[in-house]
Swiss-Prot record:
Keyword Cytoplasm appears in the UniProt entry: no
Function: One of the primary rRNA binding proteins, it binds directly to 16S rRNA where it nucleates assembly of the body of the 30S subunit.
Limits of the S4 RNA-binding domain: 96-156
Assembly mode: Part of the 30S ribosomal subunit. Contacts protein S5. The interaction surface between S4 and S5 is involved in control of translational fidelity.
GO molecular function: rRNA binding; structural constituent of ribosome
Organism name: Shewanella sediminis (strain HAW-EB3)
Protein name: Small ribosomal subunit protein uS4
GO biological process annotation, one example: translation
GO terms for cellular component: small ribosomal subunit
Highest taxon in the source lineage: Bacteria
Family: Belongs to the universal ribosomal protein uS4 family.
Pfam families listed in its UniProt record: Ribosomal_S4, S4
Keywords: Ribonucleoprotein, Ribosomal protein, RNA-binding, rRNA-binding
Length: 206
């Protein structure tokens, strides 16, 4: 399945919530009707089945993190094999993706932009260039911007935007040095309460 390259707001409207796919402190302005699905018949209210509700939740999370269907299923399988709560394990795996950590640290205005920075070899992990967006970041890893990339306007702009929003407690960032430390794995209470990971577990358990 190819990565979606269409309008970002359409995905947020499809899921009925801000997926933070657009750059900016406030990703979506008041003119965007999140409660209305895209398309000619978007205003029609459709009662979803139990399966439909579970599917929508899975799509919402998958699109938030910018992960393809096959990748997402593999993350779920890994989460199910890991000791502990499968749903929480899934969110932890998604949060430890390098592109997501780069976004959380504020080096990319969106996860898509962060993914591009990684792919274009602008990101270093513990002093070595890593260009794999799905690279798994571990506790205490140091993420930094490659020296020759530090003057990129989009990185400087992203850091400016990030300075205006609350930083995640599990990362520590030095904006001047353009580097940050992944201090610990995020706990469930650190992450969005709008995600109901149990619905995803129920979907894949069928």
């Amino acid at each position: 399945m190819a990565r979606y390259l269409g309008p970002k707001l359409k995905l947020s409207r499809r899921e009925g919530t801000d997926l933070f796919l657009k750059s900016g402190v406030r990703a979506i302005d008041s003119k965007c009707k999140l409660e209305t699905a895209p398309g000619q018949h978007g205003a029609r209210k459709t009662r979803l089945s139990e399966y439909g509700v579970q599917l929508r939740e899975k799509q919402k999370v998958r699109r938030t993190y910018g992960v393809l269907e096959k990748q997402f299923r593999n993350y779920y399988k890994d989460a199910a094999r890991t000791k502990g709560n499968t749903g929480e394990n899934l969110l932890t795996l998604l949060e430890t993706r390098l592109d997501n950590v780069v976004y959380r640290m504020g080096f990319g205005a969106t996860r898509a932009e962060a993914r591009q920075l990684v792919s274009h070899k602008s990101i270093m992990v513990n002093g070595s260039v890593v260009n794999i967006p799905s690279f798994k970041v571990s506790a205490n890893d140091v993420i930094s911007i490659r020296e020759k990339s530090k003057k990129q306007a989009r990185i400087i702009a992203a850091l400016e935007v990030a300075s205006q929003r609350e930083k995640p407690t599990w990362v520590e960032v030095d904006n001047t040095k353009m580097e940050g430390a992944f201090k610990r794995l995020p706990e469930r209470s650190d992450l969005s309460a709008e995600i109901n990971e149990q619905l995803i577990v129920e979907l894949y358990s069928k």
